[in-house]
Swiss-Prot record:
<keyword id="KW-0472">Membrane</keyword>
<dbReference type="InterPro" id="IPR027417">
    <property type="entry name" value="P-loop_NTPase"/>
</dbReference>
<dbReference type="InterPro" id="IPR031157">
    <property type="entry name" value="G_TR_CS"/>
</dbReference>
<keyword id="KW-0547">Nucleotide-binding</keyword>
<dbReference type="GO" id="GO:0003924">
    <property type="term" value="F:GTPase activity"/>
</dbReference>
<comment type="function">
    <text>Required for accurate and efficient protein synthesis under certain stress conditions. May act as a fidelity factor of the translation reaction, by catalyzing a one-codon backward translocation of tRNAs on improperly translocated ribosomes. Back-translocation proceeds from a post-translocation (POST) complex to a pre-translocation (PRE) complex, thus giving elongation factor G a second chance to translocate the tRNAs correctly. Binds to ribosomes in a GTP-dependent manner.</text>
</comment>
<keyword id="KW-0648">Protein biosynthesis</keyword>
<dbReference type="InterPro" id="IPR000795">
    <property type="entry name" value="T_Tr_GTP-bd_dom"/>
</dbReference>
<dbReference type="Pfam" id="PF00679">
    <property type="entry name" value="EFG_C"/>
</dbReference>
<dbReference type="InterPro" id="IPR005225">
    <property type="entry name" value="Small_GTP-bd"/>
</dbReference>
<feature type="binding site">
    <location>
        <begin position="133"/>
        <end position="136"/>
    </location>
    <ligand>
        <name>GTP</name>
    </ligand>
</feature>
<dbReference type="GO" id="GO:0003746">
    <property type="term" value="F:translation elongation factor activity"/>
</dbReference>
<dbReference type="GO" id="GO:0005886">
    <property type="term" value="C:plasma membrane"/>
</dbReference>
<protein>
    <recommendedName>
        <fullName>Elongation factor 4</fullName>
        <ecNumber>3.6.5.n1</ecNumber>
    </recommendedName>
</protein>
<dbReference type="GO" id="GO:0045727">
    <property type="term" value="P:positive regulation of translation"/>
</dbReference>
<feature type="domain" description="tr-type G">
    <location>
        <begin position="4"/>
        <end position="186"/>
    </location>
</feature>
<keyword id="KW-0997">Cell inner membrane</keyword>
Amino acid sequence: MVLDNIRNFSIIAHIDHGKSTLADRLLEYTGALTEREMQNQVLDKMDLERERGITIKAQAVRLNYQANDGRQYILNLIDTPGHVDFTYEVSRSLSACEGALLVVDASQGVEAQTLANVYLALENDLDVFPVLNKIDLPAAEPERVKQEIEDIIGLDAHDAVLASAKEGIGTREILEEIVNKIPPPRGDAAKPLKALLFDSWYDQYQGVIVLVRILDGSVKKGDKIQLMSNRRNYEVLKVGVFSPAMCEVASLSAGEVGFIIGGIKDVQDAKVGDTITNLHNPCDAPLSGFKEVQPMVFSGLYPIDTSQYEQLRDALAKLKLNDSSFSYEPETSLALGFGFRCGFLGLLHMEIIQERLEREFNLDLITTAPTVVYKVHRLDGSIITIESANQLPPTQEIEFVEEPFILASIHVPNEFVGGILALCEEKRGVQREIKYLTPTRVMIVYELPLNEVVLDFYDRLKSITKGYASLDYEHLDYRRSNLERLNIMINGEVVDALSLIIHKEKAYYRGRDLVSKMKELIPRQMFEIAIQAAIGNKVIARETVKALRKDVLAKCYGGDITRKRKLLEKQKEGKKRMKNVGNVELPQEAFLAILKVEG
């Protein structure tokens, strides 16, 4: 294949700006799919991707296109995940391309997520050109949005393609732009094999399928390959391309994008960003930029019905096959029984995994409040990392605790600025800058503790701005903070599942809210129940659930007071004994409500 006739490109867009629909039109136009095979969002294979309108895994599709200059081109569309949690995957997918289409909704303009991914594309030296989508909408303002693209991103947008993926307007113009504006790949097929692995997933019949962009050299069936990060060796069983169905080809050479199947059993071995080379004729150095993705948010998942524990374990193992950035380990809780502590890249990642467990595997789950990774500096000089309140050592052993901070950039219409600033201040944020991108849109940049963001920040951000805010964040560093463990006690017993790590200033208010919420939810028993919030040995808030009382004097009718007193004393004794041995059953709602108490 002549390198000059290949174009590798991806599509950058904010959620819901029409990326997957545009990809469908390109597939349809180039004849990759017949009318009969067309379905909406062909590349989003998971139901969940279609429903939420987001792309979770990367896909790569080869399109054959006869251009206006009469030449036949191969266009490789590499579809990238578009959400903030998957930034590393996006950057790897982008580095497999030479150019990108920036798709912007002509009625909404530039959003935070678009901005983050455009900067990633420019860092990877991609040629980016804008496409205004949804121009068929009555609210479309192409001229205003062109100006926004020039002002905010600094891209020349005067000749941006006007398109409507839904109506099929502008599809040929976009394909011509791809051919004319995106440079062909560079590479040398005679050099030793060097390929970038930019996605992998597990297929139950063929093992792990890896998506690669060949930079130098070539690969064919029967070759011995090596993954350079872990020095694992495999024999190539199949090479091929997606168009969009899997098609086997004789070989893949420099500049091309396709898949390799090599009998790899575990997705853990095929990490995104790794370099693949030939075992007997290796390239001199791996590609730069590879890193192990670390989970940032942790949460406990427990089956509501304990008999589903085995099913949950199998389901997690299956999800792990396709998602190497997700981690889990068994944990037990006195209150919730057996479950798993799971690690996620971020909030959206967590929601997606939970939703897939419930939907694809029919599991009913309780999720404990999400936590982040803290660094605890002990007095003996050692540093430990913890991801749940129950792992925090006693106060007398701790010198100080550090928590992770993020840099959040929030794009909002200017009428909501006051509410957003108040929210960020309440979440212990440090203001970096406020920038008016246009007379009506503002970018607010804050440094925020991740611990404050994981609970309900995103929901409140959306409700303050009526859904118009968009948020993007990147991890900054760890900072020393005044953090403590808040325990909830019921009749003097600590309920481990409800413990949390919280900032000292907020501990009293949070404790008070929690105990009053629990008071409403715990059913009354025959004895009174004390609900307390405590830091260390100091109780900071208390509520009491009053006892139910049986009228033991009903049968007495008048008569001697000593008889009544005897019965009352007996009742009192019984209640006392009951309180000592009685167990308080915490209803499921109590746990769920605790997660919903405003942080």
